[in-house]
Regions:
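Soluble catalytic domains of membrane acyltransferases
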Residues: 69-197
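Membrane-anchoring hydrophobic helices of lipid-metabolizing enzymes
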Residues: 1-84, 97-99, 109, 127
């Protein structure tokens, strides 16, 4: 790869960077298994093929790569004007996040931002739509300012208030408890909140 700005999935490097103290204790077969279950090679082919796509165009390319079809009910109820915080359950992780961002991004002409795990900032096509949250270490000093700027911006915000994708509990897939941050900040700023169900 000659393009230094192109991020490719490198499970080995991610583990070294995000867990430097524990990395030497991780068996190589575990690293190989992780590469296989995250489909490192397939995703890297996609990232290379979509390297020129940014924002909602990148989300559209993701939908194609995932061969995902979206059946949206009630899109006519989405307001055209005003600023909103869209909150949703997160049953599938990446796929539902991509789909929700794609639908809202198309509706609001690309003016959307997600609060996301900071690892996703490595995806150049997705990064313009992201406000990063560090889920594995200390938050950056400017994190509260970044969140405040997101709520103050003229972008629609997308949040998954459980903070993680849904978990299986007693045989049922459901979200973890939702954090109230989106309600508190939305009220402070004067944004309406819209609950979406995926």
């Amino acid at each position: 790869m000659t393009d230094d700005s192109l991020f490719l999935i490198d499970v080995d490097k991610i583990l070294r960077t995000k867990a430097p103290k524990h990395y030497k204790y991780i068996p190589k077969f575990v690293v190989s298994y992780l590469k296989k279950i995250v489909h490192q090679d397939e995703i890297n082919v996609f990232l290379n093929e979509s390297k020129d796509k940014l924002g909602v165009d990148f989300l559209e390319a993701c939908m194609g790569f995932l061969d995902a079809k979206v059946d949206v009910k009630g899109i006519e109820n989405l307001p055209k004007d005003g600023l909103y915080t869209f909150v949703s359950n997160h049953p599938l992780g990446g796929q539902d996040g991509v789909a929700l961002g794609y639908v809202l991004g198309k509706h609001y002409e690309g003016k959307v931002k997600y609060l996301v795990n900071d690892l996703l900032m490595n995806l150049r096509g997705l990064a313009p739509l992201c406000i990063p949250i560090n889920k594995t270490g200390k938050q950056a000093k400017d994190f509260p300012k970044m969140v405040e700027a997101g709520f103050q911006s003229d972008d629609q915000l997308i949040m998954f208030p459980a903070g993680l994708c849904s978990r299986r509990q007693n045989g049922v897939i459901r979200d973890l408890e939702w954090k109230k941050t989106f309600v508190v900040k939305s009220i402070q700023i004067g944004r309406a909140s819209c609950r979406e169900r995926v």
